[in-house]
Each structure stands twice: as C-alpha cells, then as structure tokens.
C-alpha cells in the first residue's frame, strides 16, 4: 500500500519466500537481500534454470540439480551464509540511507549483517520498530518501539490513516492455496 500511495522509497526484505513480490511490491521498490526461490542459476557457467524443476530435484530426489549446459551445480538464487549479498543491495542502500525520511523496521531479529546495520546507517530522524522484542537501540524523542504483533500494528495504523478499506482490498488479493501450502497473488497461476 505504501508503494501504491507513492510513499515507499524501498522495501528491504531478508525473507526468501517471495511474499513481498507476491503481494505486489514493484521490482524497483523491492530488495530481496537474501534472494528468492523464483529463479535458479548454475554456479559454474551462470546459465539460468527452471526454478520449479530445481525445487523438484532437490525435494523429490534429495540431490543437487545439474546444469543442462555445463553439468555444474544449480542452486536457487538465494544467498547462503558466507556469500556476498547482491550488488543491487549495496548500490541502492548507498542512496536510500540518505534519501529516506522515515524508517519502518518490522518483524526481525536484526541478527544477520549487513542488513542488521541498516537502522543505524539510515540518516533519517525517525525510526519505528514494529516487533515482539526491542532489537535496536531506541533514540529518545526520535524513535518509537511498538511491541507486539506487526499485523495488529499495521491494522491499527491503517485505521488511523483512513486506509482500512485499502488494507482489506490488499489482503483479499493474496490467498493461501492449502493444497500446495503456497501463497498466490490474485490472477496468478
């Protein structure tokens, strides 16, 4: 919704499940810091592979998929521990930390660097943490910590801003397909 209202500079997500993408966050507004499962690449030659067939090979056979081009190993486009984050993360963060006028931090442990450092890097005056636990230093008079469930706080904030109907419409777009235990956006197959 923030994107639809022209209020989102960028959404940085540590999740690899792609739910932000399915929720309709535009590619130019979304940084999936640790990658996603929507695509896969050969680690030797860089050839892209069908993500669904890679997933099936891993899940059904318990084996590492082979590249059809060079025979190398294919992995989902996710960042494993010890691997570098995508260049796009670093490039966008350099400008975003200067341009943001408000930082919303939601549902995170802030345990994994370099994403954990973003709240301290951002140069804006106000930061709001929606989280079960206080995971960052709160600056008196500048920051706000809202303990509890993120969904509850988002609903309350939308009500205060007069966006409750918009939130209900957005929630209706995303459905859970229990047969696959997979989230799908409206209109996607």
Residue ranges and their predicted role:
Residues 1-189:
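Conserved catalytic alpha/beta core of Sir2/sirtuin-type deacylases, generalized to analogous enzyme cores
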């Amino acid at each position: 919704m923030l994107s639809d209202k022209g209020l989102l500079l960028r959404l940085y997500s540590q999740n690899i499940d792609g739910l932000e993408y399915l929720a309709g966050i535009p590619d130019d507004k979304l940084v999936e810091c640790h990658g996603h499962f929507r695509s896969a690449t050969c680690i030797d030659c860089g050839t892209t592979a069908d993500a669904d067939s890679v997933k099936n090979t891993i899940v059904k056979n318990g084996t590492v998929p082979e590249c059809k081009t060079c025979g190398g190993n294919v992995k989902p486009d996710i960042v494993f521990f010890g691997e570098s984050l995508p260049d796009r993360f670093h490039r966008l963060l350099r400008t975003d930390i200067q341009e943001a006028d408000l930082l919303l931090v939601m549902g995170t442990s802030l345990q994994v660097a370099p994403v954990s450092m973003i709240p301290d890097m951002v140069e804006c005056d106000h930061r709001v943490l929606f989280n079960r636990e206080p995971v960052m230093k709160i600056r008196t008079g500048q920051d706000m910590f809202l303990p509890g469930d993120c969904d509850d706080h988002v609903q309350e904030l939308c009500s205060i801003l007069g966006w409750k109907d918009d939130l209900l419409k957005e929630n209706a777009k995303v459905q859970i397909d229990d047969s696959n235990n997979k989230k799908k956006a409206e209109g996607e197959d």
